[in-house]
Amino acid sequence: AKGVSVQVNMGSPDEPDMIERLGMVTQDSHYLNCPVLGMIYPRGENLNVMENDDTKAVAHAARLAFELGCTVVKTKWTGSIESFKKVTSCVPIPVLIAGGPASSSTKETLEIVHQSIQAGGGGVCMGRQVFSHENPNAMVSALKAIVHDNANVEQAMRDFGL
């Protein structure tokens, strides 16, 4: 395998089992020198009261991934550069953002990605924002330009016809 991903829903009734499973997977993966993507989301009816603060909850999710041995973490965007800096600064591993709401426009999605990179984010891990896009190849190219080539949103949209 080139890598492994494991999801934990903080606040879910199954959270303890998910955390235990993530720990076991990371232990085995480290032995095999295989990177682990922890997809950690603060959501669920049992979410700790402290975690009702979205930024603290996402920072806690990132820290949980790091402490359990993940190589990289995927979590949700907190809504601003300032708040996401609090997340990226609490761990020494790359913090990737998920794709966000299905209703987001191309420009909104690219703006979120650009802001996350400005806040120290490590990139993106997206599904529907790419696969459901009318031009998935152009969307991937625009995302790459923003994440890896320091393009701004307008430049990426113009260069790839979005």
Locate the predicted segments by residue.
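Histidine/acidic-residue-rich catalytic or RNA/ligand-binding cores of hydrolases
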Residues: E108-L110, E134-L143
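Thr-Gly-centered strand-to-loop micro-motif
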Residues: A98-G99, M126
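Short gly/pro/ser/thr-enriched loop/turn and capping motifs at secondary-structure boundaries
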Residues: A102-S105, F131-H133
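Surface-exposed loop/turn and secondary-structure junction residues enriched for glycine/proline
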Residues: G44, H133-E134
